[in-house]
Design a protein with these regions (language model features):
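Hydrophobic, small-residue-rich transmembrane alpha-helices and their short perimembrane loops
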Residues: 6, 10-136, 148-159, 189, ...
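Positively charged n-region of N-terminal signal peptides that target proteins for export
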Residues: 1-3
């Protein structure tokens, strides 16, 4: 009786586990193929194609994610502390990533402009936006708000330097000019967030 019950319970569990393993394997294969396809597409493009199809969508997302989420994160930090800033930052990053990804994908299907797959550009923009917004939210895993803010300032600085490097590498924008342009925007947004956090 007990053996029959164990068999009755065990077989479905084994089937579920096998199905989960198969699904995981399929997902891994799909991700690997997608990454390989993207790399091959990148290599097959000229410099102009690389910029229009890959660099520009990613850069737009990185700049937007880095700058647009500063205000809500710092406002939440000053108003309610580290945990609130972390949650607000993650929520803002997710919302911005979805919004920017859809905007990029829906605003240009790539046929007239020659900018390639709308889905790929949308995905790149969305991922870059999420990364840009999330990195300076992660310091608020630190419970001590003043310490978290100091770490966040350093992370934001690193993000701005990365943006300046990408613009220099692919768009030939001088590093100092890029830093001034992006830093000014970031400072304005961060200052507004801090101001709102003290109201």
């Amino acid at each position: 009786m007990r053996k029959a019950m164990l068999t009755t319970i065990g077989v479905p569990l084994l089937m579920v586990a096998t199905s989960a393993d198969a699904a995981r394997s399929d997902l891994t294969t799909a991700v690997s193929r997608t990454a390989t396809d993207l790399i091959e597409t990148w290599r097959g493009q000229g410099r102009r194609g690389q910029i229009l199809r890959f660099v520009q969508p990613s850069l737009i997302g990185l700049i937007d994610g880095t700058i647009s989420t500063l205000a809500p994160i710092f406002a939440a930090a000053f108003l309610a502390g580290s945990h609130a800033a972390l949650m607000v930052g993650l929520a803002a990053s997710i919302g911005a990533a979805i919004s920017m990804g859809l905007s990029e994908a829906l605003s240009d299907d790539g046929e007239l402009s020659g900018r390639g797959s709308a889905a790929v550009r949308g995905a790149l923009t969305g991922i870059a936006t999420f990364v840009g917004g999330t990195f300076h939210a992660l310091p608020f895993l630190i419970n001590d708000t003043p310490t978290a803010l100091k770490v966040a300032y350093v992370v934001v600085g690193m993000e701005l330097i990365t943006i300046a490097w990408v613009r220099r590498r692919f768009l030939s924008v001088p590093v100092h000019r890029s830093l001034i342009q992006v830093t000014m925007g970031g400072c304005v947004v961060a200052a507004l967030g801090a101001l709102m956090g003290h109201v």
